[in-house]
Amino acid sequence: PIKSSAASDVYKRQQWVLDSGAHSISCVGSTGDNISMSMEEQKMIMKSIIDFVDHRVPVYPGTGRYSTAQTIELSKYAQECGAEGVLVIMPYYLQPHKRAVVNHFRKLREAIDIDIILYNNPRFCGYEMTPLEIKAMVDEGLINGIKAAHGDANRIHELKYYCGDKLTVLYGHDYAPMEGFLAGADGWLSGMPAIFPKFARTLFD
């Protein structure tokens, strides 16, 4: 269980990340250990961080679950707390049909008004959405951004080619971020920037 006494450490860390030049904050994602949290623990942490940051930069909590209903519940709570958007990993483990994945995001889009960043992680999900499939989701208005965790800068180039400025593309791997930026990535969202935020900001600039 997460102790309430840990809140001060969470706040100190978030302030350090902000002071290091972060353009935005993502919390309770993979690096934030959300897979081991209960729904209530996840809600508690996301609310604490959203309240602490207080719109100084956008906050994008990780709200993706295999269950569409749970994903919607967490995402609606993030919106109620004041998050600017949500980071949503695709349904994982059982590798659902692509039509079911799109419908998962369609139901989520119907439930919230804030930005939706799709977390495209082939390693954890066992499948990926292709650039053309992503384009179709963008054209339908289902997503606003993508965390592309392939570790392949060419994928970044393809996404920007097909979607242009309609999609915020975030490089989502710890390795080769410069190649991702050179391919057109709009930002870097991964574990490494959370550990070395000043380095990440310097690389971005």
What do the PLM-derived regions correspond to, one by one?
Residues 9-126:
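Active-site beta->alpha loop and helix N-cap motifs at the rims of alpha/beta catalytic domains
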Residues 6, 104, 176:
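Conserved sugar-transfer catalytic core signal across GT-A, GT-B, and GT-C glycosyltransferases
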Residues 4, 19, 80, 110, ...:
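Alpha-helix termination/capping residues and helix-transition junctions
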